[in-house]
Amino acid sequence: MEGNGCGGSGATPRGVVGMHWAPVVTSPPSPQPPFLPPAPCRPDVQMQQQGGLTCLKLGKRPCFWGGDGAGQVAQGSGGGGGGGGGGSADQGKRKEKAATAVPVVPRCQVEGCDITLQGVKEYHRRHKVCEVHAKAPRVVVHGTEQRFCQQCSRFHVLAEFDDAKKSCRRRLAGHNERRRRSNASEAMARGSAHPHGMPVLGHGFPPYGLPTSSAGALSLLSSARATGPWLMPTPDISARSSAALDELIAENRAALLSWQFFSDRQPPPAGRPTGRSPGSETAGGWHAHLQARPPPPGAGGQHENQSGHVTLDLMQATTAAGGSGAPFRPVPARPPKEGGDAGCTSDAWTPSPMEGARVV
């Protein structure tokens, strides 16, 4: 027992020394890391994993990018390499299938028509109908008699068409309604263009001899109003009527003078008034006014303005048209207007009260 104890006691310090050997050593122990670093990952795998987080890859398995352990990352990288090989193989198979696939050629959908639509228009290719059956009044599609509507670009049953129309009833009704609406708006616009809402007569031209508007008549003597707006805004209807009558009288006198100029001093046909006496042939007409000396101030006739243009004054004294008709007397000149008629005399010639009104 003692020997054993001695032996034990002798072995005890040795064992104690052996148990306390590590702290007694003077050399410092090597520091142990708190955790193992993750396994190094290849740069290409790391780029693929980062790309999987920032982009959409539909139809592919996403990468496992987590911080749970390095083993999963390593397994994911290994599996990614295998998956990359499988993906490239799948892509190669898809390319082979696409190369070997025959393109579908569009054909006419009418039963019994096997015409390919390769060299036809894009319209017929898109709607799968040939040009002949697109205009046919009756075809068989899906076992039913139908007709191709040109506005809907599709086939309808025959009950949706009126007689031999190429468009269905619904589209034709909408088209007619739009046309009616546009015609009504145009008519309203034409009516609103007139001061009193009077519609345009005939084909847009007034009857011969009537003024072109209720506000006044177009004058042949006023060149400024011929190029610009010539409507005369007047307060009442009586003033407008007087202005229109003045314009018509002036136009009639201008026509008479032009006829005298082109008559070339020939005797007129029987029954046609000449508007001048037999002895006034040399005095009347335009030849008497083509003189180098300008007429005296206040006398009617032809005068030359500063620009060199020759102007015929129609309100001259009745030297040419005073033989057979009633004597006319000029009305006092009206004040100049704002429209540019400065310097023009009155366009009206009124008969004397003893002779009465007489308009040629």
UniProtKB/Swiss-Prot annotation:
One GO term describing the cellular component: nucleus
Q: In which tissues is it expressed?
A: Expressed in young panicles.
Q: Per UniProt, where does Zn(2+) 2 bind?
A: C149, C152, H156, C168
Q: Which Pfam families match?
A: SBP
Q: Where does Zn(2+) 1 bind?
A: C108, C113, C130, H133
- Keyword check for Secreted: no
Question: Where's the motif Bipartite nuclear localization signal?
Answer: 165-181
* Comment text on domains: The SBP-type zinc finger is required for the binding to DNA.
Protein name in the entry? Squamosa promoter-binding-like protein 7
Q: What does the organism's lineage look like at the top?
A: Eukaryota, Viridiplantae, Streptophyta, Embryophyta, Tracheophyta
Q: Which gene encodes it?
A: SPL7
